[in-house]
């Protein structure tokens, strides 16, 4: 990675109110807002952290976007899994370099990007081709063309089968994950891990009921994300928090 911004790269503009703007830099391009504009040429060739002013005097700090920044600001078709759940999913699934993952319900690719970033090789299935194309585009945009060598995705229905096993991990984000559990038992290697992301507790309950004696170490949790206000001697929880988004259910496959 270069020490300075270059054309074609994504940059994150932060204004004085901490609002974020994800921009793709072009030599002739301009970043426009209600507070004037900043030529992209003022960013290209400069190091991350550069401070700039717009034509109307608005101040910005320009940084390279993190994975979290990109997930929150990237183009999307489907609802994404948010960062507060992405990391716990990867920890529950024990994602790491070389791990073979079957992912279904790809959506806009937020979880795919996170697992690829952690080193996994992904075989993905998505019911809708427009979602699949969006996810592939987002992966390419943030991680680069080389990441696609570990990312094979096709249109299909995981309720019918889980193709091309064996896998080390099965990660599910779809309305009825319990329908995929029987297929996962024939696709997972012994000791493999299944993780299901379900917005409602009834979905989590039905998923748990589908996990029979071939599974162990079954657990369900949710992640509540609360930030804190710290300013001098004023220290308190922020008035708002990111509370429930989904239940995460994890289990280990031990076979019959």
Listing of model-derived features with the role each one plays in the protein:
Residues 2-3, 72-87:
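Conserved SAM-binding loop and adjacent beta-strand
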């Amino acid at each position: 990675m270069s020490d300075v911004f270059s054309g074609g790269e994504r940059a994150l503009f932060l204004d004085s109110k901490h609002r974020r703007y994800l921009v793709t830099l072009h030599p002739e391009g301009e970043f426009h807002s209600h507070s004037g504009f900043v030529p992209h040429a003022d960013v290209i060739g400069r190091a991350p952290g550069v401070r700039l002013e717009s034509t109307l005097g608005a101040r910005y700090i320009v940084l390279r976007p993190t994975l979290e920044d990109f997930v929150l600001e990237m183009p999307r078709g489907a609802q994404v899994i948010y960062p507060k759940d992405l990391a716990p999913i990867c920890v529950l699934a024990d994602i790491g370099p070389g791990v073979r993952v079957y992912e279904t319900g790809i959506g806009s690719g937020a979880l795919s990007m996170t697992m690829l970033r952690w080193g996994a090789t992904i075989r993905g299935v998505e019911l809708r081709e427009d979602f699949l194309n969006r996810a592939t585009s987002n992966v390419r945009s943030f991680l680069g063309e080389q990441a696609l060598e570990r990312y094979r995705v096709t249109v299909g229905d995981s309720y019918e089968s889980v193709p091309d096993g064996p896998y080390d991990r099965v990660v599910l984000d779809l309305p009825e994950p319990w329908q995929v559990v029987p297929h996962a038992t024939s696709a997972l290697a012994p000791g493999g891990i299944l993780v299901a992301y379900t917005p409602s507790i009834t979905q989590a309950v039905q998923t748990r009921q589908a996990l029979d004696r071939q599974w162990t170490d079954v657990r369900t949790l949710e992640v509540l994300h609360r930030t804190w206000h710290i300013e001098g001697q004023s220290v308190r929880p922020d008035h708002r928090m990111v509370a429930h988004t989904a239940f995460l259910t994890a289990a280990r496959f031990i076979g019959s």
